[in-house]
A protein has these predicted regions:
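Active-site-proximal beta-strand elements of phosphoester/diester hydrolases
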Residues: 9-12, 26-30, 110-118, 133-139
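Internal alpha/beta domain cores that form substrate/cofactor-binding pockets in large enzymes
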Residues: 121-152
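Pre-active-site segment of Zn-dependent metallo-hydrolases
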Residues: 2, 17-68, 140-152
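Metallo-beta-lactamase
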Residues: 2-6, 74-132
């Protein structure tokens, strides 16, 4: 399933995973699995790919992302990960290009990234690219539903 808004294509991958396609690059957030097999078509477009993982939980991070560099050798990949992924042994420091914690910022010629807070593990992401600001919440949740259940 995807939506196109003002030169931005947003594709739902699975769970908290999304891909954002814009003119200059592709952003992939919190990849876990791809049951509809939509990513090969997205990743094969020849654009730089920025891969974000908000935290170490298995439903927000998969080591499978590191294989993409070998599967698509002519495409530049930048892995931007929450530092807790290394701390919890999800990956080695040298596998990530950028490691971030809440409050960190990073940019290159294409994107600007800020790691914001989460009320669960890791971070949420604010990404600025081509005059657009994109927010991915990671595991950020207001947990409002617990207040809807009457106490017994």
């Amino acid at each position: 399933m995807y939506f196109i808004l003002r030169n931005l294509k947003l594709t739902y991958i699975f769970h908290s995973g999304f891909a954002v396609e814009i003119h200059s690059c592709i952003l992939v957030f919190d990849y876990w699995m791809d049951p509809t097999i939509c990513l090969p078509e997205i990743l094969s477009k020849g654009k730089p790919v920025y891969v974000f993982a908000s935290h170490f939980h298995g439903d927000h991070f998969s080591r499978e992302i590191f294989a993409w560099r070998k599967l698509y050798p002519n495409i530049p990949f930048v892995y931007i990960l929450s530092r807790d992924i290394v701390r919890h042994h999800g990956c080695h420091r040298d596998e990530a290009d950028i490691l971030m914690v809440k409050g960190d910022g990073w940019c290159d010629k294409i994107i600007k990234v800020i790691a914001a807070g989460s009320n669960d593990s890791g971070v949420s992401w604010i990404v600025e690219v081509e005059g657009k600001r994109i927010f991915h919440a990671g595991d950020l949740n207001n947990w409002y539903a617990r207040f809807l259940i009457p106490k017994t």
